[in-house]
Amino acid sequence: GGGYSQVIPMEDFNLHLTGDIHAITASHNLTAAALDARVMHEKMQDDEKLFNALCPLDKKGKRKFSPNMLRRLTKLGITKTDPTELTTEERSRFARLDIDESTITWRRVVDINDRMLREVQVGMGKDEAGHEHRSGYDITVASEIMAVLALTTDLKDMRERFGKMVVATNKRGEAVTAEDLGVAGAVTVLMKDAIKPNLMQTLEGTPATVHAGPFANIAHGQSSIIADRIALKLADYVVTESGFGADIGMEKFFDIKCRYSGLIPQVVVMVATVRALKMHGGGPKVVAGKPLAAEYTDENLDLLRAGLPNLERHVQNALKYGVNVVVAVNSFATDTPAEVELVREAALKMGAMDAVVSTHWADGGLGAKKLAEAVIKAAEKPSHFKFLYPLEDTIKEKI
């Protein structure tokens, strides 16, 4: 946040916090390391050596399958549980993932904007001669592990989801997962504390849970289900944010998060600003670090009016789900009374249950009091929430 509407302590919030992102980095890169090592060892060893390395003799001179290995056997359609009973062909199928290297999608991650690592050549050591290949680094929060963290409901569920993460396909076109690599359990252990939401507060002492942050463009863009469930046990009203606008973040909130969690919203709070609507109306480009153009600092009702269809489409998207909509006009100091009133009146005509000007950035909680009252009033009205499609439909039908 910013101004008088922010979560504190800001320095802890932005610098490590409780280390959730670092746990994701370690978990993701562990998977990448296991993937590269598996490819290398399968090239260097025959089936028997691979099998013996995966299922070594214990102190009593016997081999035993771990629970993870039994899951892999089940996936392969092998019902035997004694390693000594497997045929030569079954041992080969069990031990060899036979990964098609051109299909590997699991790169490494780092929580630094280091552009020189975006594309790299790995395996350059003398012990890895002949195993060099191109790879790269992505930003940590883009990891699928972050998306899983936000969708999980408990440790068991998280363990199962980690096991289903696809890292590549084999030469038969079948998915190779973290479960196949044997790392899903280790990843879960590394994430055992990250599954716990972080409790922080606003400048005025309102509790705020901070947990997970998958991107809305490549993942689903929501805070965690666990954080929402805990918050609902502690407060009368819970406000949870979805990334981006009603055309992506809100739809993923409904289509993905609500389906998995079973939580149904009573109200959609649609945030709009005069500045953004002027941009949608054809205003000049806003460049970071440069002064705003006069169109954004002076009253310009025509430009603002031209951008209102954008807000209308967002409101319509929300109303399709049968949920009451309250438009929050997030007012800046440069907005004129005529401009904010134009947005407010237009929002009501679009079908919003209410539209309220909010000055929380400048005035804190007092500046958002009328908005809060409008949201409470809307929450007391019946909500007729519905999903727009059943999961059984084809992708084409859903779209």
PLM regions and their residue ranges:
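Flexible phosphate-sensing "switch/lid" loops adjacent to ATP/NTP-binding sites
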Residues: 1-399
